[in-house]
């Protein structure tokens, strides 16, 4: 399941979902501070949510 975690630059929630086996991505207007830029999208979370790429958004 592909999950978008909106308004999250720390990647704490993203990491927790990844540890549970989900394909999770954080999204924020800022660069991430969690150390996994490959799991982070810099941009508008609303536009990303409507892209149709995700099964769930938090």
Regions found by a protein language model. Give the residues of each.
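Catalytic phosphate/metal-binding cores of nucleic-acid and nucleotide-processing enzymes, i.e., regions
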Residues: 1-58
